[in-house]
Structure formats: structure tokens, C-alpha cells
């Protein structure tokens, strides 16, 4: 009996160490490299300084931004929740926020935490192309998918109640004399593992409420307009921290 107790105690210690390692993994807390700008450090101050509401057709919020600063359930520091009351019931586009700066090619790091099962948000590249954040779904509309187009090559989501990270390398669409010659491409690392490798993005999905060009030719009418990094509000407690972007020239 004593040996069984010792074995059980050791297993709990190892399990605890595994959890600790998971939340102190190298993909979390990544510092912004030279030339990058930190857009969200988890504080309301950084939120209001660097972000604005995206005022699309469904916009229903009012300034100032109502995404609240809350306490990080893991580390105790400040984080920002996407649970804006204007987006209650899954009204994407009603209270989404976007960086004031706009980009063409860029690299970005985004850390997120889903508080409850079914939590839903999303990261939009150039305020066009969505990388899904959705607990409980691994389809083309599920976690880490390039929405409606590309499944992740592996399941790297750590689950509800843990921090996760996207590292993004984005190449904007190319144009010559106003004509689209190359579609946008993205490489995505999820919790340190490459899950999308320079995949081509065909269009904007979700209609005009989803972002720039969503209403152009059913989302296929991509224009040569830069856009910000956008975070989606759907009335869920999805927390964000440590978001930085580096423009690539």
C-alpha cells in the first residue's frame, strides 16, 4: 500500500511539472524582436492606445472600447477579454477590434486563453483572412484553421484554461497595375509547431461583416489595400495578451 501511495504521489508531481512546463513553454511570453511593436501587453492602456473598433456594416458598439481588462487565471497579471456586450450571442462584426496600424507583409505573435468550453474568437490577417479560435471543433471552421480552406496539419491546442500561441508569417496578395497576380499566403506555428506551411488563401469568408473585401464579389474581390490585425468578439471570454507585429519589407 505504501509503495502504491508513493507511486501515486510521484505521478501527481510529474503531472504538475508537465502542466507547469506547458504554461512556461518557449512559445509563451515570446519577446518582440527588433523592429516589432507590442500592440497588446494585457493592459487596458495598451488596448486603447493601439486598437480601435472595426466599424463594419454590423458595428454596434460605442467608444471607448468595452473589452475589459481582467486578471490572468494562470499568472495573475492583466489580460484583455473579448467579451464585449455588443457582441453577445455571437454577433461577429459588432464589436471586433483592429490595430490602428495597417500592414501588408508581416510577422505576428498572439497569445490567447479560452475560459470555457465552446469559446469563440478569431485572428484576422489584414482584417481579411481569419485564423480561427474555437474550442471543441477541428474542422475547416475549427481551431487553428485558415477559415473554410485549410485544416491544421496537427492538433496542437492545449485546451480550455490554458494559454496558447499563434506565430504568424503573412505574405499579402500581389498586384500589378491594379490586377491581382498572387493570392495571400500564410505560415502558422501553433504552440511552437508548424501547422500551415505557406498555404494560399483564396478569399475572405463571412461576408461584409467579416472584414475588408468581405462584400466584394462574395469575398473573392481582393483589393490592394493594407489592413490591421483584427481580433473578433463573439460574446465569449477569450483572453489575449502579448500581441506584437513586425512589418516585413
Question: What are the residue ranges of the model-derived segments?
Answer:
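Bacterial N-terminal signal peptides that target proteins for export
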Residues: 1-7
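Carbohydrate-interacting regions of secretory-pathway proteins
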Residues: 19-249
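Bacterial N-terminal signal peptides
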Residues: 7-16
Amino acid at each position: 500500500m505504501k509503495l502504491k501511495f508513493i507511486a501515486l504521489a510521484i505521478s501527481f508531481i510529474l503531472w504538475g511539472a508537465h502542466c507547469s512546463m506547458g504554461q512556461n513553454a518557449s512559445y509563451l511570453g515570446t519577446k518582440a524582436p527588433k523592429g516589432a511593436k507590442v500592440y497588446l501587453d494585457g493592459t487596458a492602456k495598451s488596448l486603447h492606445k493601439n486598437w480601435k473598433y472595426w466599424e463594419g456594416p454590423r458595428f454596434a458598439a460605442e467608444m471607448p472600447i468595452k473589452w475589459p481588462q481582467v486578471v490572468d487565471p494562470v499568472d495573475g497579471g492583466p489580460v484583455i477579454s473579448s467579451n464585449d456586450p455588443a457582441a453577445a450571442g455571437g454577433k461577429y462584426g459588432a464589436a471586433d477590434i483592429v490595430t490602428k496600424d495597417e500592414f501588408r507583409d508581416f510577422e505576428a505573435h498572439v497569445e490567447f486563453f479560452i475560459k470555457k468550453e465552446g469559446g469563440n474568437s478569431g485572428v484576422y490577417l489584414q482584417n481579411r483572412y481569419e485564423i480561427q479560435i474555437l474550442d471543441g471543433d477541428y474542422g475547416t471552421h475549427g481551431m487553428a484553421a485558415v477559415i473554410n480552406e485549410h485544416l491544421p496539419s496537427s492538433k496542437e491546442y492545449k485546451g480550455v484554461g490554458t494559454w496558447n500561441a499563434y506565430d504568424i508569417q503573412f505574405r499579402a496578395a500581389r498586384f500589378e497595375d491594379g490586377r491581382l497576380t498572387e493570392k495571400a499566403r500564410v505560415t502558422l506555428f501553433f504552440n511552437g509547431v508548424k501547422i500551415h506551411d505557406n498555404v494560399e488563401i483564396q478569399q475572405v469568408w463571412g461576408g461584409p461583416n467579416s472584414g475588408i473585401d468581405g462584400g466584394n464579389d462574395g469575398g473573392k474581390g481582393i483589393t490592394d489595400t493594407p489592413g490591421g490585425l483584427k481580433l473578433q468578439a463573439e460574446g465569449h471570454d477569450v483572453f489575449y495578451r502579448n500581441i506584437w507585429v513586425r512589418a516585413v519589407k
